């Protein structure tokens, strides 16, 4: 067997094999950050996206933006209407005065940079092969073993179970900051549930049965998108919608997140311009199902950047794995027919994580034919 490439020089011809890339990026823990830091001049072939998936600036809807909502009067009729309208018509909105301390957000971003600044062998302790627990995972792309083209991204994914597990297994270099962020977001999460579910969907109350169905688990990801030698050939993240109830996204000032606009063409995208101190909320598949399609989980993607590194930190607010996803009875009370059949959240999640990003196809599993 021929020796695998160590990418120790800047010379690449774009024809590097999957084995070359997998050994350096995945097995040795360098990630795509390691490729970028080697100063490679040509994007290795495994990262080349099919022509139909590559992003073109021509697809961007100019002078358009997702709704920006001030949450300081979150329970006022005007703000409630703005949030529910955004969830119906955009599936994405950006919020300011959200109640999460700005100092906490800055510490989260700093901790993210610290983790990805670790030596490869230390980050590799959390890889699929080496991590002592499935709930903590460092990796690259999305599901590399089934992808025809890799995504230009490294990530650390941490599923919250308990304080004890977190203190034992989460990387110490970023653990406290992520826990602080999760705790600081709880009031915001409850307010969003009150607005979207109680006021928007007329669900009478979120009781001890419904709360786990809506917000019973949390996953936080640290994403790192290094600068790319040929950004036009690849993507940071391919087209997909989240499977969460909703996602709270913290991003830096670099930009790169694009959201599909719901319009007649179905092929226009809006760039989510970073706003200092803001958070981005996007509706997930779970809430689309529970609202019987009233709220929309929208396709989004991240484009690669040729000049700057980018980070983002999504906090996925998910149903409990044992929860059953189905439309709320209150939503169907006026005779509206259900669009979705009941499906276990664990089954839905398993389906999502066993295939490449493919737009909105995951939700088809729950649709009534």
From Swiss-Prot:
TM region(s), chain numbering: none
Domain of life: Eukaryota
Fe2OG dioxygenase domain span: 209-319
E.C. numbers: 1.14.11.61, 1.14.11.62
Reported cofactor(s): L-ascorbate; Fe(2+)
Cofactor info, note text: Binds 1 Fe(2+) ion per subunit.
Family matches, as PROSITE patterns: FE2OG_OXY
A Pfam entry, by short name: DIOX_N
Known pathway: Phenylpropanoid metabolism
Recorded catalytic activity of this chain's protein: (E)-4-coumaroyl-CoA + 2-oxoglutarate + O2 = (E)-2,4-dihydroxycinnamoyl-CoA + succinate + CO2; (E)-feruloyl-CoA + 2-oxoglutarate + O2 = (E)-6-hydroxyferuloyl-CoA + succinate + CO2
Keyword Oxidoreductase included in the entry's annotation: yes
SS bond list: none
Residues given in the record as Fe cation binding sites: 240, 242, 300
An example Gene Ontology molecular-function term: 2-oxoglutarate-dependent dioxygenase activity
InterPro entries documented for this protein: DIOX_N, IPNS-like_FE2OG_OXY, IPNS-like_sf, Oxoglu/Fe-dep_dioxygenase_dom
Residues the record lists as binding 2-oxoglutarate: 225, 310, 312
GO BP term (any one): coumarin biosynthetic process
Alphabetic keyword roster: Dioxygenase, Iron, Metal-binding, Oxidoreductase
UniProt similarity note: Belongs to the iron/ascorbate-dependent oxidoreductase family.
Protein function: 2-oxoglutarate (OG)- and Fe(II)-dependent dioxygenase (2OGD) involved in scopoletin and umbelliferone biosynthesis. Converts feruloyl CoA into 6'-hydroxyferuloyl CoA, and p-coumaroyl CoA into 2,4-dihydroxycinnamoyl-CoA.
Name under which the protein is recorded: Bi-functional coumaroyl CoA and feruloyl CoA ortho-hydroxylase Diox1
């Amino acid at each position: 067997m021929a020796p695998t490439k160590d990418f120790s020089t800047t010379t690449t011809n774009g024809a590097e094999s999957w084995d070359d890339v997998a050994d350096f990026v995945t097995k040795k823990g360098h990630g795509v950050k390691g490729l970028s830091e080697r100063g490679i001049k040509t994007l290795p072939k495994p990262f080349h996206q099919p022509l139909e998936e590559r992003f073109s600036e021509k697809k961007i809807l100019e002078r358009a933006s997702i709704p920006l909502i001030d949450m300081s009067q979150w329970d006022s009729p005007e703000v409630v209407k703005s949030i529910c309208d955004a969830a119906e018509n955009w599936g994405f909105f950006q919020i300011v005065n959200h109640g999460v301390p700005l100092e906490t957000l800055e510490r989260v971003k700093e901790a993210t940079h610290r983790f990805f600044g670790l030596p490869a062998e230390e980050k590799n302790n959390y890889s699929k092969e080496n991590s002592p627990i499935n709930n903590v995972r460092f990796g690259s792309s999305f599901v590399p073993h089934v992808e025809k083209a890799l995504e230009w991204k490294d990530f650390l994914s941490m599923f919250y179970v308990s304080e004890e597990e977190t203190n034992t297994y989460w990387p110490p270099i970023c653990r406290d900051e992520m826990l602080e962020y999760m705790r600081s977001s709880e009031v915001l999460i409850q307010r969003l549930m009150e607005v979207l579910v109680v006021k928007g969907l007329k669900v009478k109350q979120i009781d001890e049965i419904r709360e786990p169905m809506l917000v019973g688990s949390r996953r936080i990801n640290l994403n790192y998108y290094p600068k790319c030698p040929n950004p036009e050939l690849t993507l940071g993240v391919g087209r997909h919608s989240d499977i969460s109830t909703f996602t709270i996204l913290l991003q830096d000032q670099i930009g790169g997140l694009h959201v599909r606009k719901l319009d007649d063409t179905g092929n226009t995208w809006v760039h989510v311009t970073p706003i200092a101190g803001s958070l981005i909320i996007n509706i997930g598949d779970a809430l689309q199902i529970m609202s019987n399609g009233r709220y929309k989980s929208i396709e989004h993607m991240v484009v690669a950047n040729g000049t700057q590194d980018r980070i983002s930190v999504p906090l996925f607010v998910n149903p409990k794995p044992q929860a059953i996803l189905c439309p709320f009875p209150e939503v169907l009370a006026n005779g509206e027919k259900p669009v979705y059949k009941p499906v276990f959240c664990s089954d839905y999640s398993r389906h999502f994580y066993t295939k490449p990003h493919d737009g909105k196809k995951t939700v088809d599993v729950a649709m009534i034919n």
